[in-house]
């Protein structure tokens, strides 16, 4: 396992996620988020909590890249990464995101947007991790002759 590549993949995907998160939440879904503002923290509170979110997001990306490396099957890294990202998104949706809709009074539109965004973003992050991660290649010399 190539831990240097795992770390690089995690950090690059994390940096991309910061940009994508801003574009998605503050631009593309701004209207949907505004329609659900009554169930969200005030913006000042969110800004104060961002460092916590960023740290745990980075930890999550290390786990994501490590899990990808453990399951890497030796094929096209980007394709394997997309497949891995979609699989992880389905786990996250089933165990976590859908429960936001069940537990909190968000609109069905917001819930659907979160689900679709999660699939697309995690597929993107999987592609990034798959493009960067390369396993350590072990070369074996010729067997000794007597």
Kindly give the residue locations of the regions a language model identified.
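Juxtamembrane/disordered regions of integral membrane proteins
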Residues: 1-146
């Amino acid at each position: 396992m190539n831990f240097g590549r795992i770390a690089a993949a995690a950090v690059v995907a994390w940096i991309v996620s910061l940009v994508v998160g801003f574009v998605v939440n503050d631009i593309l879904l701004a209207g949907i988020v505004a329609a659900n503002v009554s169930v969200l923290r005030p913006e000042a509170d969110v800004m104060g909590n961002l460092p916590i979110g960023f740290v745990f997001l980075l930890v999550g990306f290390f786990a994501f890249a490590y899990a990808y490396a453990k399951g890497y099957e030796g094929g096209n890294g980007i394709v394997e990464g997309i497949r891995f990202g979609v699989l992880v998104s389905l786990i996250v949706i089933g165990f976590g995101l859908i429960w936001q809709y069940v537990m909190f009074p968000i609109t069905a539109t917001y819930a659907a947007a979160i689900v679709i965004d999660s699939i697309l973003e995690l597929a993107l992050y999987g592609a990034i991790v798959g493009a960067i991660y390369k396993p350590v290649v072990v070369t074996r010399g010729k067997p000794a002759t007597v």
